[in-house]
Amino acid sequence: MLKRKTVAIKDVYVPVKRRQTLDSNKVEALAESILAKGQEAPILVREDGTRFVLVEGLHRLEACRALGETTVSAYLVQARQH
């Protein structure tokens, strides 16, 4: 079962490859939705030392950041072994 927690946005690292897929129109639409309904779906992160690495939810993360939020709801997932 996934562990849900609130994490500081500043502690979430977004890998460069993932950051390149950012769509500002999606961020804007999600920000409007979050204002109206709150954050309905947590992002997915994995622990990496003292920070969290984003696994899924870039647009949700950036929408929360754009709204001036300092924390985001997240599910903590296990890192995949390669």
Role assignments for model-derived ranges:
Residues 81-82:
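Short, charged recognition helix plus adjacent turn
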